[in-house]
A protein has these predicted regions:
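Generic N-terminal amphipathic, Lys/Arg-enriched alpha-helix
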Residues: 1-15
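Generic alpha-helical secondary structure signal
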Residues: 6, 19-23, 87
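Short secondary-structure junctions and interdomain/linker hinges
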Residues: 15-19, 35, 155
Length: 163
């Protein structure tokens, strides 16, 4: 087993957080629409999660989409941020508040500005090892999101590949 494997086996134990998972799952299930705000490599991991949710029948959008549905009090804006203070995401908090949209931060840093402004926070422990790219954040989010998917009902799952 190499160093990467040892680090990840150890780290995934830290990412199992039933209270956070319940909070995120409840927010997803209770929302009419879900808009995700996430940037960079974390944004890529989030888009993978969005695809899974879409295949399960949830109505999802990303802040970078050209057509974001009108948001309201039955919807949620989920901010996925490793730092908790991604500058380009901060403006979306004000938009969500104006729409009376619920807000949730999924982060490794609950002390960041985004976390302070969101109604709910799901904080996870920062990876101890930094790896080649100086961060394992996006891989941590992939693991977190896959755990969440594993707890959601699959009755409405639709496989969208055409092969």
């Amino acid at each position: 087993m190499n160093e990467f494997d040892r680090n990840w086996i150890s780290y995934t134990k830290d990412l199992k957080h039933p209270q956070n998972e319940a909070k995120i799952i409840t927010a997803i299930k209770r929302s009419r629409r879900i808009v995700f705000i996430a940037k960079g490599r974390v944004g890529l991991a989030t888009k993978m999660f969005m695809q899974r949710l879409s295949q399960m029948g949830y109505h999802v959008a990303h802040s970078e989409d050209l057509l974001i549905p009108e948001m309201g009090s039955q919807d949620i804006a989920i901010f996925v941020t490793a730092s908790g203070s991604t500058t380009s995401s901060l403006a979306y908090i004000e938009i969500a508040k104006r729409c009376k949209c619920k807000t949730l931060a999924i982060t490794f840093n609950a002390k960041g500005e985004i976390s302070r402004q969101c109604e709910q926070i799901a904080e996870y422990p920062e990876p101890k090892e930094k790896g080649l790219m100086k961060s394992y954040h996006e891989v941590g989010f992939v693991y977190i999101f896959e755990r969440i998917i594993s707890f959601l009902p699959t009755e409405q799952f639709v496989h969208t590949n055409f092969e």
